[in-house]
Amino acid sequence: MLRYRFAIAALLFLLCGAALAGPERLISGGDAAATPGAGSDRPAEFTLPDLDGRQVALGRFLGKEPVLLVFWATWCPECKAAIPEINAMTTGPLAGKLQILGIDFRESREKVARAVTSRGIRYPVLLDLQGQVARAYEIVGIPTYVLIGREGKVLYREHVLPGDISRYL
């Protein structure tokens, strides 16, 4: 039974990656694609709308506080499972020491807003409607977590949350 569950989890992970990596998901051009991201010490700069339509730029946080980018989608079970742990970072010992930005991948504002409300997400969620930021960061599977230090360097990039994120801060 354990093997079966592991096989299903591995298959879901691969399918999430395949969905994001397909040719229809790639973009040509855009601000985010022109600046360094994955494979670089510098994060790709971007500006994306939040659920209220306000434009949020990564640059407004750099140099002030570390930023955790959470690449996710409403249909991703692993993303849903991580919400309580991410929410805990907004009220626990890390509160005020870490800016968390959820980045939803290619879904409508309405769908994302419903998920944010029903799942009790307590951190800002931005809409990557064209997938340009995911492309700039070479996201091939979700969830993907990118931790950017106060100095603007990428410190962590994985599909799981770091066990002790405070050691990176």
Positions of PLM-derived features:
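Short pre-active-site segment immediately N-terminal to redox-active cysteine/selenocysteine motifs
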Residues: 64-67, 72-75, 141
